[in-house]
């Protein structure tokens, strides 16, 4: 838990992940300005938080290194649903987790979460989020 690695800014692409303000984010857009007379090229990175959905942006030299989260994508079964939490059990380790319904579940699937279904969850930086329902053809 809490795993992250370093990656050079020039290697980042939209759709990948980055840590901004200690929050794992999915990169939405990268704009690179050409090097000027007195400086190196700079990249403006716009990203959306995985857990809070907030848009964040940073400007870094393309030669700089940034933290990238290591995201563990796993399958779990929903054991119980309460008004404010979802209890899930990992299908490999049989570990139990309590996930808050407001911040730990993707908006589109909140109303579809029910006991007994399998879900895909992401674990990164000590936090868990249920991303999608497994086995659902849409």
UniProtKB/Swiss-Prot annotation:
Species classification: Archaea, Methanobacteriati, Methanobacteriota, Thermococci, Thermococcales
Gene from which this protein is expressed: eif5a
Record has Cytoplasm as a keyword: yes
Full protein name: Translation initiation factor 5A
GO molecular function, one term: translation initiation factor activity
GO BP annotation list: positive regulation of translational elongation; positive regulation of translational termination
Entries under SMART domains matching the protein: eIF-5a (SM01376)
Localization (cell): Cytoplasm
Main location: cytoplasm
Gene Ontology CC, one term: cytoplasm
Superkingdom to which the source organism belongs: Archaea
Keyword Protein biosynthesis part of the UniProt annotation: yes
Alphabetically ordered keywords of this record: Cytoplasm, Hypusine, Initiation factor, Protein biosynthesis
Family membership noted in the UniProt record: Belongs to the eIF-5A family.
Function in brief: Functions by promoting the formation of the first peptide bond.
Residues with the Hypusine modification: 37
Gene3D superfamilies named in the record: 2.30.30.30, Nucleic acid-binding proteins
